[in-house]
Amino acid sequence: MALWMRLLPLLALLALWGPDPAAAFVNQHLCGSHLVEALYLVCGERGFFYTPKTRREAEDLQASALSLSSSTSTWPEGLDATARAPPALVVTANIGQAGGSSSRQFRQRALGTSDSPVLFIHCPGAAGTAQGLEYRGRRVTTELVWEEVDSSPQPQGSESLPAQPPAQPAPQPEPQQAREPSPEVSCCGLWPRRPQRSQN
């Protein structure tokens, strides 16, 4: 009982102490286009990740996106509206020092419909020969296949053997079928589990 009474003032201070305004702003806008507008896309050594912006930077981007979307569109008239990029797809990468000025920031903006943005997350492979790409929660893997060319000289002369066709490499299965989905993707429910087929 005495321990609880000692911790009561500390709990009261924690309850009164508000969260960081940038974190609170990001927590309020965790769905749809606001998610992209309130975050920086940063390239790290293990792939791309998002960090929250301050409230002022996010509001400036929203105001500029609204003024740009009200101007005339540069898209061709024949292009379908669903094929356009969403207006709120604002990808911001901080390529300067941490805490640098806004002149060191590279901003790329695409205008279009108000659909929710499609986010690509790039995770390079461990050996550098495979690249992982996540598209709406589905993992796409592309691998580099090296083919060895037989450059040994053919024996010439009276003992020449009949010409043999060069050895063809065995066809490799598709990387999608050969790999199991990674456990960190399947545990979140993003990757649909395939039923195991019974071999009879």
From Swiss-Prot:
Region ranges (Disordered): 148-200
Compositionally biased residues, Pro residues: 163-174
UniProt GO molecular function: hormone activity
Name of a matching Pfam family: Insulin
Distribution of this protein across tissues and organs: Expressed in pancreas, eye and, to a lower extent, in limb.
One Gene Ontology cellular component annotation held by this UniProt entry: extracellular space
Listed Low complexity bias regions: 175-184
Origin superkingdom: Eukaryota
SMART domains xrefs: IlGF
Xref: PANTHER family: INSULIN, ISOFORM 2 (PTHR11454:SF32), INSULIN/INSULIN GROWTH FACTOR (PTHR11454)
Listed name of the protein: Insulin, isoform 2
